[in-house]
Amino acid sequence: MTQIVALPGGRAASYEVIGSGRPALMFAGGPGFTASYMNGDAELLSEVLCSYLIDPHGSGSSTPPADPAHYSPEGHARFYEEVRQALALPEVVVLGHSFGGTTALTYAALFPQSTAECVAVAAFGIGPDADAQDEGDAEAEFEALLARHAGSPWYEAARPVMDSWTERLLAATDAAEMEQMMAMVLPFYLAEPDKPEAAARLAEMSRVMKANLAAGKAWEGGLYQGVDLRPLLGRIACPTLIVAGELDFICGPAQAQPIARSIPGSQLAMLPGCGHIPSIEAPEQYRQAVAGFLSR
């Protein structure tokens, strides 16, 4: 059930609560997608976490930021800290997926007093001016993993959308267009999207994902160019787990490995045969990795 919490300045945030364990904040990807697509993550971890799935500002019933620049990872992290304070939650676990994983890392660096543990799933944080080797590895990984789907029936329609994502999104006039675009490219996010069980889970994820076009436009309009977490990663003091799929075309080993190297004492769980959404592709493997880390 969706709930609303009041924030300073007449603003509000919408959220759901799933589970009965330690308090945790779950951060969705995008930026701009509602947190409901992470209900599966929360249910998998319901025995160890009481998860607060918070809609990002501007999504669901959460108030948009006054400045579109606040759709950055730091802007999201500061919004989530306001929500934590408004909910009177103590020190929390933060768990984020994709852009939400990048936000979770940012949150842990900026708010160490609020963060018990950090779990970043399929996160990115190595910017476009990264070490040439890391950048080259990421570009090669991206192209190779897209091309491996070339024989799938959806590929010919989806590949042009992926290749012109920024231009199409900036030209979109409503959130429904962004959601339709996302539905077309979502199969790329799985290592084996044509398996019936994976396809069914992906279809359900697409059904519940609601987009905030303003966040998408701000991101594709240039915010992403400033994302490089390396100056922050060394400041993360809490126990941290980096989870990545070895076949993730966006945030695979070329992102996960340098991120993990940059965080003192962090752990890296590289899930074989997985793409960008391990909670859908290998739910039990994902649950064991995260629950094992949190229960250590």
Question: Where do the model's predicted regions map?
Answer:
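Conserved HGGG/HGGXW glycine-rich cap/lid loop of the alpha/beta-hydrolase fold
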Residues: 7-64, 69, 250
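Active-site loop/oxyanion-hole signature of alpha/beta-hydrolase fold enzymes
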Residues: 56-99, 110, 288
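Conserved hydrolase catalytic core segment
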Residues: 90-137
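Flexible "cap/lid" loop of the alpha/beta hydrolase fold
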Residues: 118-168
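Alpha/beta-hydrolase
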Residues: 155-231, 238
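Short beta-strand/loop motif that positions the catalytic acidic residue
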Residues: 236, 242-244
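Conserved alpha/beta-hydrolase "acid-adjacent" motif
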Residues: 249-255
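Catalytic active-site module of serine/aspartate enzymes centered on a nucleophile-bearing elbow/loop
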Residues: 265-296
